[in-house]
């Protein structure tokens, strides 16, 4: 796994309080990890902060799985 993927996975694990093994490329934040819409907004904000980027709202709405993340 790349450094970026490792960093994304760490954010997901920390923000959603899930086990690292449960986070795969196709893991749905909502369906598989029990996140709600506020959780997904917080994840996007954490990705933006970690990587020093801004994710437009329309792009943020498409981030539903670990594999969709930046």
UniProtKB/Swiss-Prot annotation:
Record localization: Cytoplasm
The keyword Electron transport appears for this protein: no
Keyword Zinc recorded: no
Annotated GO CC locations: cytosol; membrane
Top-level taxon of the source organism: Bacteria
Keyword annotations: Cytoplasm, Fatty acid biosynthesis, Fatty acid metabolism, Lipid biosynthesis, Lipid metabolism, Phosphopantetheine, Phosphoprotein
SUPFAM superfamilies in the record: ACP-like
Modification O-(pantetheine 4'-phosphoryl)serine, positions: 37
GO BP terms in the entry: lipid A biosynthetic process
One Pfam family cited in the UniProt record for this chain: PP-binding
SMART domains associated with the record: PKS_PP
Pathway where it operates: Lipid metabolism; fatty acid biosynthesis
Annotated InterPro entries: ACP, ACP-like_sf, PKS_PP-bd, PP-bd_ACP, Ppantetheine_attach_site
Domain Carrier: 2-70
Stored Gene3D superfamilies: ACP-like
Any GO MF annotation of the entry: acyl carrier activity
Record PTM text: 4'-phosphopantetheine is transferred from CoA to a specific serine of apo-ACP by AcpS. This modification is essential for activity because fatty acids are bound in thioester linkage to the sulfhydryl of the prosthetic group.
Main location (coarse class): cytoplasm
Known function: Carrier of the growing fatty acid chain in fatty acid biosynthesis.
Family membership: Belongs to the acyl carrier protein (ACP) family.
Protein name: Acyl carrier protein
Species, as recorded: Cereibacter sphaeroides (Rhodobacter sphaeroides)
Gene that specifies this protein: acpP
């Amino acid at each position: 796994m790349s450094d970026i993927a490792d960093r994304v996975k760490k954010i997901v694990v920390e923000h959603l309080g899930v086990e690292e093994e449960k986070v795969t490329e196709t893991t749905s934040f909502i369906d598989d990890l029990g996140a709600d819409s506020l959780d997904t907004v917080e994840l996007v904000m954490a990705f933006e902060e970690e990587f020093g980027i801004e994710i437009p709202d329309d792009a943020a709405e498409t981030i539903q799985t670990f594999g969709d993340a930046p």
